[in-house]
Amino acid sequence: MEYQYPMNEDWTTEEAVDVIAFFQQVENAYEKGADRDRLLNAYRRFKEIVPGKAEEKKICSQFEADSTYSPYRTVKQAKQSDQAIIKM
C-alpha cells in the first residue's frame, strides 16, 4: 500500500520516528501479527508525544483513512488480550 504517515511539523525527528514506529506496529498487527508488548510500548510512547485525545483521534483517523488499519481497535484488542501476538 502507498500512503503517508500522519505528521506534525512541531515534532522532533525522534518523535516522528517513534510515531511511525507505533503505526508500523499497527500495520504488523494487520499484516502478520504484532508482539503485544512492543505494540503497547509503542502506544505508550505515542501517547507521550500526542497526549491529547482530540489530536490522537485526528491523527489516528487520518492513518485509518489512508491505510484502512485502525489504531484504536488494535490497541483496544492488545489491552484486552493476554496473547503474546496480536493479529487483526
UniProtKB/Swiss-Prot annotation:
Family named by the database record: Belongs to the UPF0223 family.
Q: Which Gene3D superfamilies match?
A: BH2638-like
**Cited NCBIfam families:** PRK04387.1
Its domain of life reads Bacteria
Pfam families noted in UniProt = UPF0223 (PF05256)
What name is this protein filed under?
UPF0223 protein RBAM_014500
Q: Could you tell me which SUPFAM superfamilies the record lists for this protein?
A: BH2638-like (SSF158504)
Q: Which organism is it from?
A: Bacillus velezensis (strain DSM 23117 / BGSC 10A6 / LMG 26770 / FZB42)
